[in-house]
């Protein structure tokens, strides 16, 4: 996700996966990981703020190592956010990427929303 505590991430994207956790498990998903370009302490606080509990593993990517490795970095400097991750949802099975839904804009959460993604798998 683009960033902890940001508008779309906090209002739609992360809450959607928390709300649909049971459906994800029923569809065979064993772990939901939320990755954002923030440090681990911010991710922990955001998870607590969103009541993610043990449903979502909150993973910080402060140096963009993962984000750059998958080619998801996007420059949001004009909004004062610097380099961030694009908004996407990825299905990984046994270390292999099976499906990716990536938004054209970080403010959009349609293809990558829990509801849309879970319907598509």
Predicted regions located by residue number:
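Chalcogenol-based redox active-site neighborhoods
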Residues: 1-121
């Amino acid at each position: 996700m683009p960033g902890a505590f940001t508008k779309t991430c906090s209002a739609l994207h992360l809450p959607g996966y928390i709300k649909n956790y049971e459906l994800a498990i029923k569809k065979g998903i064993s772990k939901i990981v939320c990755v954002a370009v923030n440090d681990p302490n911010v991710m922990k606080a955001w998870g607590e703020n969103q009541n993610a509990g043990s449903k979502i593993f909150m993973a910080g990517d402060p140096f963009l190592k993962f984000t750059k490795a998958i080619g998801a970095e996007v420059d949001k400097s004009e909004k004062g956010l610097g380099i961030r991750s694009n908004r996407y949802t990825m299905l990984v099975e046994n270390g292999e990427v099976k499906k990716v839904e990536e938004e054209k804009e970080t403010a959009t959460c349609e293809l990558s929303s829990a509801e849309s993604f879970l319907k598509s798998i």
